[in-house]
Amino acid sequence: MSLTQTPLLQDLGIQNATLHHNPGVDELYAAALRRGEGKQAATGPLVVHTDKTGRSPKDRFIVEDDLTRDTVWWGGFNTPISPVVFDRLLDKMTHYAEGRELFVQDVFAGTDPQYRIAVRVITEMAYHSLFVRNMFVRPTAEELEHFQPDWTVLNIPSFKADPERDGVRSETFILVNFTRKMILVGGTQYAGENKKGIFGVLNYLLPQRGVMPMHCSANMGEDGDVALFFGLSGTGKTTLSADPSRRLIGDDEHGWTDTGVFNFEGGCYAKVIHLNPEAEPAIYRTTQTYGTVLENVVLKPDGTPDLNDGSLTENTRSAYPITQIDNIVPEGRGGHPKNIVFLTADAFGVLPPLSRLTPEQTMYQFISGFTAKIPGTEQGVTEPQPTFSTCFGAPFMPRHPGEYARLLAQKVRESGANVWLVNTGWTGGQYGEGQRMSIQHTRTLINAALSGQLDNVKFEREPFFGLEIPTEVPGVPKEVLNPREAWADKAAYDRTARKLARMFRENFKRFEDGVDPAITASMPEHREA
């Protein structure tokens, strides 16, 4: 169906383009191969290599106007631009797009009809259109007949900005305009910008409607009990939420309403570097399936994907519809969470493997969003480096973290959900001295928490962070439960714990003006021994 005469494209100013409206998988494969965008692996997936191999958070801008001036938390990842800059780049992009071949997908962001937004994504690359089709919620044929977009994404990677003339940082740009309900993307082929751009939009819009947007995975037990898993990269979020005894609601983005949780997406965008087919069989199968997009995966001479080759990037990805996973909740919705798990990989080795959080600690840990990077090969880096990403997703959160924390605390109070902090990092010493937390112990602890096994267990409070630790969990040695007991040198543990507590306090200073005093009162400095 041609879109050349629709009001939308007239509004955009794109003339004489060859448009493919809601093309299917076969058509998009054919177009991507014809245009030289990628290759089809012998096992079926479309394999593409991109100029940028990750997101460009420093090139993301939000239009500052009357709507956003006092509602966006400016600074950090939220950089303002003027409406004039946006309009000028939009004009240049639409003229650049004239006469080109473009692909249009009409999709929903959100599985809950009450809160979803309708999104029209116009892309220069066929593979981006397949990515969008895989990742978002696909409307029914009837819904497509009456589709009216709330938001428009225009993504033209070959259009590169002139930083000096166009008022942006580099040739790459991601511009979000909440007043005009548009996202412009240029100068990058990385498909994740389509997904995370709309995630940021939902993270801005939904709190106004009392919905908590979350960067987390979600699954459901046999009895319908829902669990959420928050965690930064490398904490085990994907592995630990992929439980054969629980059905997957979604792996990355969710909203929490007055009735329960819903997935923002209709697909998954999984990291696949060194993916183990025995440890992650469901995700591995998707990397061998027709319809999947494999991003920056290297092909072997026989045309099969080499998931162990990170020569292009360690950030190799598989984008596939969630329906390719067998053990899912097909409607992408569930009730109120019974348990919430914050995952952290503490390379300092001082946080407990599992602790129970109070409502105030929940807000504090959520705003902090802590994990730690291990020392690399960089000269002079000999100790773990703390990483704080507020709300476990700082690049995607336009509002003040205090807003999200208050909303989460309200939802936790109303639902009575248990909140757990789980350390998947080090024990018995920091990185280089201790050992990585046993995945079996972590699974045992999480299963005990989700099953209600810990409801009647005695807890003790550790002195440095005020965290409540279970004194006994079947299958986990007692000396593992209390991190101080796992260290041979108790004085070294105390020094390291105080050091990490100071890092938490220092990081939290930038949030204190926008959070409740009760959160500040739960800070480690009030517990320091």
Swiss-Prot record:
UniProt keyword list: ATP-binding, Cytoplasm, Decarboxylase, Gluconeogenesis, Lyase, Manganese, Metal-binding, Nucleotide-binding
Family annotation (Pfam families): PEPCK_ATP (PF01293)
Binding positions (substrate): 55, 190, 196, 317
Alphabetized GO MF terms: ATP binding; metal ion binding; phosphoenolpyruvate carboxykinase (ATP) activity
Compartment(s) of residence: Cytoplasm
Highest taxon above the source species: Bacteria
Record GO biological process: gluconeogenesis
Binding residue positions for Mn(2+): 196, 215, 252
Gene Ontology terms: cellular component: cytosol
Catalytic activity: oxaloacetate + ATP = phosphoenolpyruvate + ADP + CO2
Protein name according to UniProt: Phosphoenolpyruvate carboxykinase (ATP)
